[in-house]
Amino acid sequence: MIHGFLKACTVSPALRVADCAFNTQQTIAAMQRAAADGVQLAVFPELGLTGYTCGDLFFQQSLQRAAAKGLAAVLEASAALDLMALVGLPVAVDGKLYNCAAVVCHGKLLGLVPKTYLPNYGEFYEKRQFNPAPAGVRTLHFAGQEVPFGTKLLFRCAEMPEFCLAAEVCEDLWAPLPPSTHHALAGATVIANLSASDETIGKADYRRALVSQQSARLLCTYLYADAGHGESTTDMVFAAHDLICENGSLLAESRPFGPGYACTELDLGRMVSERCRSTTFQPESEDYQTVMFHLPLREVELTRYVSPAPFVPADDNARAERCELILAMQADGLAKRIAHAHAKTAVIGISGGLDSSLALLVAVHAMKQLGRPTQDVLAVTMPCFGTTHRTRSNAEILCEELGVTFQEIPITRTVHSHFADIGQGEAVLDVTYENCQARVRTLELMDLANRTGGLVVGTGDLSELALGWATYNGDHMSMYGVNADVPKTLVRHIVRYEADATENEALRAVLLDILDTPVSPELLPANENGEIAQQTESLVGPYELHDFYLYYVLRFGFGPAKIYRLARRALGDRYPDDVLLHWLKNFYRRFFAQQFKRSCLPDGPKIGSVTLSPRGDWRMPSDACAAVWQAELDQLG
């Protein structure tokens, strides 16, 4: 439960129809196994203490009493377990029978939640035996305890307030307006569904989509426990299709007719963060009653999958679709700006590196979209002290194969003159030595754009902006930045996508060589072999780490300790802990110190959910203090 993680499971034990003693034993044994495995929330199927398929036996008072006795045994067993459990049983209230979810924790019956929507179609005849949930919440004496009874019940953990649970039962989810919608608006972050959904052709896919979509719509975690082996097969079969979804993502699943057990860690902090950002998620807690309960805080071992590259889809087809869409978005944004500005040219500084190559590809797509010749793209290479033959050659070949106008402007003489103007020693390889080159290049591009009636297309990417790895008013500045919302890890895949998609072998070859070239601003002289000496990732750290950190800082607002923990899970097989922590500290230091550059960014299209535009998703003062984050980092080591 530390860092907002909660280990939870859905369980579908084998049962015997109407054998409450056996079913109770199965339930208790499953609870004990789950608790021993560190689970703190277990959800069982609908009417699991009796079996869903009892039919008119539900009217038998002996069965009702046996179910209540079974619940009492579950309560007694739960007293020794650090676990909340939800079990299903029939409950008679004032001469009417209700299909209920019983919420159990530490020997206490926290609440009874009756089913709202009773199916009475096809193979289902629930209205024959049961009544729909009554309005409001009342107190009952049941299983030897005073207990709240009703649908408008929330169960909140005192030690972990973001763990707020509510329940619904099977058909409730299939209704046009499920009770879980109201539960979530009232504050529930976890929805438990006790279900007995029989299996028919195509139903598993529909069920999976339904649970996933509801978790996305409600910004919650949704646990769905399905009836399974042992239910009557007189007219139906039940598949124990258990599901756990979180904000639209399937975290765990027990395949139909499988083991009937799904287990994972819920990230409740993530759900709370999502709701904080969503202004359309308006709380509605009228008439709801909150029941507090206690569970000990414990550190949960993470077994859930954490992507090492959160910006990049793991599936090949999904990744290709993502790359194609991003290219289309970038090109459309640039095309609109070119048309609006009546620009005659799109001027790009081309270095032979990844970012400028992507910007050039985008500009070519934009011109084609506008029905204009690719020659209207003016690509300019400006070699200086650190330019290598490899990058210079790749820049020219790329421009030739794309059919753009290519121009070379050596800037060495201009930079030397500028050094003399400001008294910079030519042998002093400091920040001034580097930034002078970047600013001279921007000056050349801006003036070329003026002379040709064009606009300067920016090449800097999201990762560089997060780290401030750009010269202020140098490569930091342009007239429209097409890459500003694309992280470096994704830039690579987009360029590779273009390489794979083209039928031009020469173009493919040069793009692949650019992908193989070390990332560098080439502002310091090459080594004795004429190769790149200044490699970005050896100076600021691996971009796959910084992109990982950036994603969780901006997307969910997680703190350093939780991000470090996630990084160890996702990237621990590639980097030792001390390296992960070193670059995490470096990320925070640079992120806070470099905000002043992000406060005056050029326009550029929003691409994903993580962006640093000062006019859009990220508004941060340039002089904010990082002491809070630094203190948390210091505690990590």
Feature annotation, model-predicted:
Residues 1-347, 365-374, 401, 406:
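Enzyme catalytic cores with a strong preference for nitrogen-chemistry domains
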Residues 6-7, 23, 161-163, 220, ...:
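ATP/NTP-dependent adenylation/nucleotidyl-transfer catalytic domains that generate, transfer
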